[in-house]
């Protein structure tokens, strides 16, 4: 469990490390921050699409084994990204890196689904999320610090390659001690199609996956440009701007620490509704606040609200198809990161052409509506 959490740390850091680097990348290659956001977009798109490969592979060959192999792939590809000479080469390397990273967090969660009873799964996933959330915070901070440092984005990517290599080797060395689920019989596209049909045959899966897609578009897309927004609006250094937004992860850690009590006291429906309202209020505050320092406390509130919704979605996703849980979690991640890719493309265009107000107003209105719709559906299901 600890090694999987550390693996999730580095995978999550890769998702957020470029947020604070976008202005630096844009300056070095002579492009706008919105265009530089392509390094986030291609990572998310490849990450989402590759779920369709890693999910069935995890069910067939073992989830922990595939996580270790994916980590070593991330090590090699982050080095390739660090050595890229042009922006197109960097985009290609980030896309390949995202494809490899796709095998880490979702398969780790699927392993938890195999090994932990449902009644204990939400608190267990919350503890696992400490690794994921800490990685997001560290990635955000590292991106800002390296953006203001001489090594720039190349140094950030090299540091991540070192971490990937260490964790990947340790995990593969520990495989014989890790509990595994019986493999899904057969191989090839026929089995893959059968597993996907198993997931989608459950009507509740469509609701969970649809809300997850919306979360990716409305939340994760605009989040990528928040350091650039604070840098542009208030003149903050990229390290300070990234540090303020990184407090988002602290809100997630607060959730993880109290997850068991929150589930018992509120129930899933109330958690989801409250989370959506907190996220909407946070984006509104980022848009309207006249001073920079409020961005940090607002990020904490948004982070807490995010995980009230997101961890509930994850827990429901582990039950979409217990017989093909790797594929189910891969489909969940495909929707989340496919949504992020769409969101980054739309938010980048808004940031460059229409202003940050549009970029922030849409999630301020949309996230509460999405969360309330899921809360209502959850109550009906109960």
Where are the model-predicted features located?
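C-terminal transmembrane helical hairpin of 12-TM major facilitator-type secondary transporters
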Residues: 269-313
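Paired small-residue
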Residues: 73, 88-96, 293-301
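Juxtamembrane intracellular "pre-TM" segments in multi-pass secondary transporters
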Residues: 176-208
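Helix-breaking motifs and short loop linkers at transmembrane-helix boundaries and internal kinks
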Residues: 30, 62, 83-89, 235, ...
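Helix-to-loop junctions at the C-terminal end of transmembrane segments
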Residues: 50-62, 255-267, 351-352
